[in-house]
């Protein structure tokens, strides 16, 4: 194996170690509470630990942490993690949680051209939510049915923030105080996960911008040997956007493969939508037409991916193709795609 190949494998294994460290915490409301408090506190090191560990959470847990993560929008040292973690949340579910939180924060900044406003606007544009930018400064945009959330302070300033009353902060989600031993175990797991993520980032640093690394990962993802696919996908979390974007066509091939889930979907969702869309959409439809062995569930998987990103027109295209497919099972799945994603 080449030196580049060995480095990719090492990065992938370190990311696996990071995920294994928090594996017992997945779906654990107490763990979400600890992460939320760390993100809400003044300790930047703890907050970074929480952000790094959050890459391995279930979607539900990550969604519960959105208000706490959003408190770090505009903090440059956390910017890359904030953008990518929020991108991993399906946009249909992210929108109603994130936008009011950002709007509440901006009510504290009178300057419409200030750095926080620019950071919030840039984040929404990256997520494909540019239609929501107006709501950030429009006091009437919340509507009359749902009041805006309480204004959070900056992380650690003691202001009333999401962690005071929302999932991800305060008491554990079930309302019961966890034992000190349980909380200590959670904190240890989070720190261990963050430790491995930092090691992975350090090991991946020489690979960033290296065309040989991108070419090798692309080659490994273009085969079905099963030897290096998971290492490649895990290592890709540590690549910069430009390198990850170059791998989109190769990653697309794995979207409907259960044994590597959820890595393909999450990697694609981490990218800025304006750059992702012109690469992703042709790759998806080319792959759907190319692979004659796709079953009906594969069609649903790709529709689900595009729905997660917010590409409704492309979901409609998949449904239309499925509805006219020669396979009756695929045609039936086309109807399910319409019912699941396009009814509202």
What function would you assign to each model-found segment?
Residues 178-181, 185, 189, 339-344:
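Terminal, non-catalytic domain-edge segments
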